[in-house]
Amino acid sequence: MRLLLIALVPLFLCSCGGYELKNLVKSDIDLVTDQFITKTREDVSELVVMLYKRNPEQLAKNPGMTIEGRLAQLKVHRYRLQFLELEYNQGTDAMNLAFSPSFTGDRVFALVVGLGSMLRQAYAYQPEMFLPDQLEAEVLLTSAQNVEMLVWKLKNTR
């Protein structure tokens, strides 16, 4: 009887609306982190659209490229964002390309690849978190400070 009950509990939990079996191996913090990861990726996508609408000449540096194409490039790489056109730079290195006077490529793409890869690194390149996963507070703090500096640079650089 006890074995039958153990076998049926996951079945009943899975039949509950919105509950996924994988959530059995997630803490409350993991669920909150998953929501934050999803939200930051959505925000970066919105930023891509906004920056390309304000700077269409950057998108035009790659003939035939569209905003949707750039978004697809960011989404197809689930973990590390590495692109030849940015010489495989990530994080702050890619973001600094966007502000470098000698860089002739797509500055918007460099900026969002840098931002996106930095945020992914902060979450240990995990698209979602589970019980054994751990976040490093120092890496999260550094990425938050880098985002603050990026916002300042965007406001004060023309």
Could you describe each region identified by the protein language model?
Residues 1-7:
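Sec-dependent signal peptide recognition
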Residues 17-110:
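N-terminal Sec/ER secretory leader and immediately downstream segment
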Residues 91-158:
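Mature extracytoplasmic/lumenal regions of exported proteins
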